[in-house]
Amino acid sequence: MRILLSNDDGVHAPGIQTLAKALREFADVQVVAPDRNRSGASNSLTLESSLRTFTFENGDIAVQMGTPTDCVYLGVNALMRPRPDIVVSGINAGPNLGDDVIYSGTVAAAMEGRHFGFPALAVSLDGHNHYDTAAAVTCSILRALCEEPLRTGRILNINVPDLPLDQIKGIRVTRCGTRHPADQVIPQQDPRGNTLYWIGPPGGKCDAGPGTDFAAVDEGYVSITPLRVDLTAHSAQDVVSDWLNSVGVGTQW
């Protein structure tokens, strides 16, 4: 199995390094990751400037000023030959639950892989300690995929409780919950008296009931949520069409 491994925490982050070490025990792994933390970069792609790369002695590649999406784009189309069999993103330091997936560079890297037609996993740890647990879970899933491919055409967003492996209760297939909208802005002044702004933490849990990714992780289970690239709200198409006709906009041209 050939794995393109990326993340949004940066090439030296403990999550990606722990996962790379574990994956290399049974797979051919190419790390292509940002040279710094790009958390919250979502699906941003660098189009107005060139990208430089640096290759470390162990073969890991850092994309200087690159986003997670840049890294997977370059990895698939230029840096990994032959091309990968699967794209894996993570292990993220902290969860990507509910609305987090909209902003997450970790999920975006997996989404870019899926966009190119590859199976893709996004892996996050609900904390900053037990990366070995998340790595073991990921390896188990990938070994299973080797034996029996999962032909859903979907991204698997995997969130792992920050627990020792022997305390993980199992795996649940979940849906995304939701958070309350975040509204905290933290102002500061620089030495010249100019105001600086920091975006605050994410909103608290809103929909975290049974069946959600929040609930599974809170209860000690690994959460796996299938995600899709197509954002079309198919069930709303007829509603929008009927509304356009009823207000007369749909018949103006």
From Swiss-Prot:
Catalysed reactions, semicolon-separated: a ribonucleoside 5'-phosphate + H2O = a ribonucleoside + phosphate; a ribonucleoside 3'-phosphate + H2O = a ribonucleoside + phosphate; [phosphate](n) + H2O = [phosphate](n-1) + phosphate + H(+)
Name of a matching Pfam family: SurE
GO cellular component: cytoplasm
Cofactor(s) recorded in Swiss-Prot or TrEMBL: a divalent metal cation
Cofactor: binding details: Binds 1 divalent metal cation per subunit.
One GO molecular-function entry: metal ion binding
InterPro entries: SurE (IPR030048), SurE-like_Pase/nucleotidase (IPR002828), SurE-like_sf (IPR036523)
Protein's job: Nucleotidase with a broad substrate specificity as it can dephosphorylate various ribo- and deoxyribonucleoside 5'-monophosphates and ribonucleoside 3'-monophosphates with highest affinity to 3'-AMP. Also hydrolyzes polyphosphate (exopolyphosphatase activity) with the preference for short-chain-length substrates (P20-25). Might be involved in the regulation of dNTP and NTP pools, and in the turnover of 3'-mononucleotides produced by numerous intracellular RNases (T1, T2, and F) during the degradation of various RNAs.
Name under which the protein is recorded: 5'/3'-nucleotidase SurE
Gene encoding the protein: surE
